């Protein structure tokens, strides 16, 4: 799973330096992404550990031990899936509260609340003595994810110099992938620590949570948030501090003007339903759906379990997950380099073909060579791992970051916070659906699960081809005239809004 906020697209160039202080702020705030990534990666490894299964899911452990057991069904357990998915359901709910907290209290206090939720959740999960304590811990971690994923990207977007905003915001996505990789490495080493290795693995999230909590005391609130809450003098002083220059009048006035426009919209959620807001709203929500139905989080959540299913031993499965995590990190750098060179549409279309081929190859190998009680021969198992890695590469430079980048740059200012909150909630909902259903789907559909995701990749590729316009280099202020009004389908909604405005003025 992936989160990115773009530059605000404003064509004006304000005088600003990339200061050491801004760099420190970016790194500290982006630790929120590392925690999110760690939580994504840690659950699959922990659910593959025998000590964890014996403690909380003895029936799954007994099923796993029997060689004659159905390979695809040995991990099928609703409570086991709830251990992973409960975090994302909680994050969905929390994101609505976090949106209000960001507006009323600011970005920094919201990050601090996120870190407190993380710490309490880590303590409960790592120290759990029964399934209920374990799930409650995961739910509190989910609250941390909901608050962190709302506040951190907004913070990064508002504190970065305009010319560097896109790249600095992808640091959040980069930290997510690094968090996944660290979790995979931790899983690999703690799996051999009996009987409490799983407690160490779950407790590891407490370290970055502490860094975020105490590090947030060193960073400032964003100028936009301060001005939005009528702290204009403090906002201007903060702007001078983060830009490293004294003359910030032009950018300051731009922020004040943007905040004034935003205040005029009394009900942003109603505004989102207007015809002119429909294109970014529909695209933003569908991109979240499609991002999850690429199947990426099914692979990232359950990589160790998946590799065990195709015949790898426990340690080898965890090591294979480390390899995929490394590929994920490195491929994110490719996305940073390509997104403003090749454009958004090219990456979406290229990766759709790329991921489709990988899913089909994996599905064909499993359907042909893996029966329900056997294992894959070593060559076929290695081919599966290779194509999983190639698949992860394609996602990491396309549907991962772009699933968030495109909505962030197409929502107009007056509905951006609310639109983004809905995008976060939508993403968390479908992440929950996949996390809760994947192991049951794997049991019911067997290798067909990969053909299922292949079908959705075809649908999303066609959607990108016909309905996602290119937004590279287009100012947000010009999005309506330069993108939506020129698009073969979306222009009808712009015309409808224009006609409504004319009728309103006439009346």
From Swiss-Prot:
Report the principal subcellular site.
Answer: membrane
Q: Which CDD domains match?
A: MFS_STP
Describe its membrane topology: Multi-pass membrane protein
Give residue ranges on the Cytoplasmic side. Answer: 1-21, 469-507
State the superkingdom: Eukaryota
Name the UniProt key words of this record, in alphabetical order.
Membrane, Sugar transport, Symport, Transmembrane, Transmembrane helix, Transport
SUPFAM superfamilies with a match to the protein in the record: MFS general substrate transporter
**Keyword Zinc set for record:** no
In the record, biological process GO terms are:
monosaccharide transmembrane transport
Q: What is known about what this protein does?
A: Mediates an active uptake of hexoses, probably by sugar/hydrogen symport.
Alphabetical list of NCBIfam families matching this protein: SP (TIGR00879)
The entry's family comment says:
Belongs to the major facilitator superfamily. Sugar transporter (TC 2.A.1.1) family.
Q: What is this protein called?
A: Sugar transport protein 8
């Amino acid at each position: 799973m992936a989160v990115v906020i773009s530059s605000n697209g404003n064509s004006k160039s304000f005088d600003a330096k990339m200061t050491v202080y801004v760099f420190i702020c970016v790194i500290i705030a982006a630790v929120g992404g590392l925690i999110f990534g760690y939580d994504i990666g840690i659950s699959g490894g922990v659910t593959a550990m025998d000590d964890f299964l014996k403690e909380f899911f003895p029936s799954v452990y007994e099923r796993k031990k029997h060689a004659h057991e159905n390979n695809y069904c040995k991990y099928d357990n609703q409570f086991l899936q709830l251990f992973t998915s409960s975090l994302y359901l909680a994050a969905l709910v929390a994101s609505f509260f976090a949106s209000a907290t960001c507006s009323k209290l600011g970005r920094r206090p919201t990050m601090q609340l996120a870190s407190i939720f993380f710490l309490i959740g880590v303590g409960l999960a790592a120290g759990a003595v029964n399934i209920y304590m374990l799930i409650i811990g995961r739910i509190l971690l989910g609250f941390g994810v909901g608050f962190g994923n709302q506040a951190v990207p907004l913070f990064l977007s508002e504190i970065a110099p305009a010319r560097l905003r896109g790249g600095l915001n992808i640091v959040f996505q980069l930290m997510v992938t690094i968090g996944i990789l660290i979790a995979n490495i931790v899983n690999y080493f703690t799996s051999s620590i009996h009987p409490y290795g799983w407690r160490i693995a779950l407790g590891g999230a407490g370290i970055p949570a502490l860094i975020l909590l105490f590090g947030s005391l060193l960073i400032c609130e964003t100028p936009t948030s301060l001005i939005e809450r009528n702290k204009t003098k403090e906002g201007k002083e903060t702007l001078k501090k983060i830009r490293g220059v004294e003359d910030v009048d032009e950018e300051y006035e731009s922020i004040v003007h943007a905040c004034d426009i935003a205040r005029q919209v009394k009900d942003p959620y109603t505004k989102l339903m207007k015809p002119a807001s429909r294109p970014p709203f529909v695209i933003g929500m569908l991109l979240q759906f499609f991002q999850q139905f690429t199947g990426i989080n099914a692979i990232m959540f359950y990589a160790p379990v998946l590799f065990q299913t195709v015949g790898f031993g426990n340690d080898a499965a965890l090591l294979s997950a480390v390899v995929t995590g490394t590929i994920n990190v490195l491929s994110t750098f490719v996305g940073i380099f390509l997104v403003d060179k090749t454009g958004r549409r090219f990456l979406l279309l290229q990766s759709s073909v790329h991921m489709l081929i990988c899913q089909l190859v994996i599905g064909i190998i499993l359907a042909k060579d893996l029966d329900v009680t056997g294992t894959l021969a070593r060559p076929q198992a290695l081919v599966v791992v290779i194509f999983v890695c190639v698949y992860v590469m394609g996602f990491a430079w396309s549907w991962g970051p772009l699933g968030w980048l495109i909505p962030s740059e197409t929502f107009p200012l007056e509905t951006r916070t609310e639109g983004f909150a809905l995008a976060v909630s939508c993403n968390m909902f479908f992440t929950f659906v996949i996390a809760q259903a994947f192991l049951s789907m794997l049991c019911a559909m067997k290798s067909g699960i990969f053909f299922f995701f292949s079908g959705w990749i075809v649908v999303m590729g066609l959607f990108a081809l016909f309905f996602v316009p290119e937004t590279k280099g287009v100012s947000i202020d010009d999005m309506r005239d330069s993108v939506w009004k020129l698009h073969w389908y979306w222009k009808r909604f712009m015309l409808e809004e224009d006609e409504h405005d004319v009728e309103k003025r006439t009346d």
